[in-house]
Amino acid sequence: MKPTLFVLAAGMGSRYGGLKQLDGLGPNGETIMDYSIFDAIRGGFGKVVFVIRKDFEADFRTKILSKYENHIPVEVVFQSVDDLPEGFVRPEGRTKPWGTNHAVLMGKAVIREPFAVINADDFYGRDGFRVLGQWLSKADGQNRYCMVGYRVGNTLSESGTVARGICRTDANNYLTGVVERTDIARVDGRITFTGDDGQPTTTDDNTPVSMNMWGFTPDYFRYSEEYFKEFLRANIDNPKAEYYIPLMVNKLITEGTATVEVLDTTAKWFGVTYAADRQGVVDKIRALVDAGDYPAKLC
């Protein structure tokens, strides 16, 4: 059975000033998602599921879903701040979504096969989908997951410093933890970040970082449901608390419930965080098209 691609497309896009998911950046108005789906099809994926918000469903179906009718099966699920387990009610004034792992839970009803999770507004590159598709196509058990580890040198911004989750791995390349680091940049040819002591620290170009590209089997939904209740009991009155994928993954690793293999990729990541980033992404996509990595018109 071919794996499914699960696309997190419900984000607000507030810093960008609009819905990044629907912004046409390619030569013929292609979105970043369009390139991800093109690469996923090349990487052996057999279905795409999008998690979105109900309020932009009409635009999404018109601008996104209609493109894929003859290329790959697609489904849509919805994330709502009111979608909580039995016994829990959204606190008055809570408008912030419950986070990326809450979004993943929305896929439970339609995903029965190994699946990948990606952000809608990140350009992951062909090789990322290749290594992830290969791993998921052979996934046949439970409690064994994976994450594509991007080389930090391939994720830097030309506009300034970035924050990244630097991966700690054991001798067999299994994830032991993700440490958030800030102020990452290339300085005098070396990659530096702010260490625990507040001082600049260097790291190797090939150090793996998490760009939220995960591979799971359906048993992950069960663990996520259980822990979401635990999360809500502790955080429901915190208006800013979010249930993130790394939070869930770290719990599974530290408790010995699951393993997460870190897959290396040569792909270069890029994305749009602020409106000012847009032109740089347009130029990078154009360069990839000119190099023959992608057709001028995807579909």
Walk through the language-model features, giving the residues of each.
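Hydrophobic packing residues within well-ordered alpha-helices of enzyme cores
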Residues: 60-64, 132, 224, 281
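A phosphate-binding catalytic loop at a beta-strand-loop-alpha-helix junction
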Residues: 4-17
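Conserved core of the sugar-phosphate nucleotidyltransferase
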Residues: 126-214, 218
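Active-site metal-binding loops of divalent metal-dependent hydrolases
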Residues: 12, 122, 152
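A structural signal for short hydrophobic beta-strand segments in well-ordered beta-sheet cores
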Residues: 22, 166-169, 262
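Conserved N-terminal catalytic core of the sugar/cofactor nucleotidyltransferase
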Residues: 1-7, 27-117, 124, 129, ...
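A C-terminal functional module that forms or caps the active site or interfaces directly
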Residues: 225-258
